[in-house]
């Protein structure tokens, strides 16, 4: 019950959790370095946070996070000069820069081509594994999910359909889950939540609306 927590406990919870939305909240005139370093805000005090808006610290952290997504050449670019896919990757770099132990990612591949999507998933998994964190992502790509994540949870209308290792998710199960949307099984399906394997907890949710 987060709403019952005191300010100190609430700050601690915020430090442990990071949400990367499908469309990251990036003010148009903001520099990429500032956008990425926003991932460190839960670990900063108020004065340090305000100072960082003018004189960014930890530039090396931002540069390394951007390099995970081939964006290190955009470090001082304005975000409104980036493409949609680049802005989405800046949002993911912000997650990489954070120190959170629970990483929640909403449709991180929606604006990316297949190779960028594969690279992004590998970077997210690498981050979670190195940190011992839990990575949960919402995807629309069944093939990517099965290839990159250890555990899949299928939901239909908010109810559990299956909760299995990815290796046990068969075409028959997917056909049952998406009985009215079989054309999407070739690559796209309604929101799929996944979690990183290895050191991270492995969760995945495949809701069928």
Located regions from the model:
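ABC ATPase NBD coupling module
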Residues: 1-18, 48-55
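ABC ATPase nucleotide-binding domains
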Residues: 171, 178-209
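Conserved ABC ATPase "signature" region
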Residues: 49-74
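Conserved ABC ATPase signature
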Residues: 78-82, 86
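Q-loop/switch helix immediately C-terminal to the Walker
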Residues: 30-44
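Catalytic Walker B motif of ABC-type/P-loop ATPase nucleotide-binding domains
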Residues: 103-106
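H-loop/switch region of ABC-family ATPase nucleotide-binding domains
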Residues: 139-140
């Amino acid at each position: 019950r987060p709403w019952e927590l005191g300010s100190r406990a609430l700050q601690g919870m915020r430090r442990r959790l990071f949400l990367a939305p499908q469309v990251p909240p990036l003010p148009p005139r903001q520099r990429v370095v500032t956008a990425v370093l926003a991932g460190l805000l839960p670990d900063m005090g108020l004065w340090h946070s305000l100072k960082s808006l003018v004189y960014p610290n930890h530039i090396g952290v931002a540069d390394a996070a951007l390099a995970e997504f081939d964006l290190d050449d955009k470090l001082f670019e304005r975000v409104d000069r980036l493409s949609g896919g680049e802005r989405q990757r800046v949002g993911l770099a912000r997650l990489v820069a954070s120190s959170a132990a629970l990483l929640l990612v909403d449709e991180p591949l929606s604006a990316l081509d297949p190779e960028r999507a594969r690279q992004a998933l590998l970077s997210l998994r690498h981050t979670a594994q190195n940190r011992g964190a839990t990575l949960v992502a919402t995807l629309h790509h069944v093939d990517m999910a099965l290839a990159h994540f250890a555990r899949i949870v299928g939901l239909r209308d908010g109810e559990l359909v299956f909760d299995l290792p990815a290796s046990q998710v068969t075409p028959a199960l997917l056909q049952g889950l998406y009985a009215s949307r079989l054309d999407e099984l070739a690559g796209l399906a309604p929101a799929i939540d996944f979690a990183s394997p290895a050191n991270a907890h492995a969760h995945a949710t495949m809701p069928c609306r």
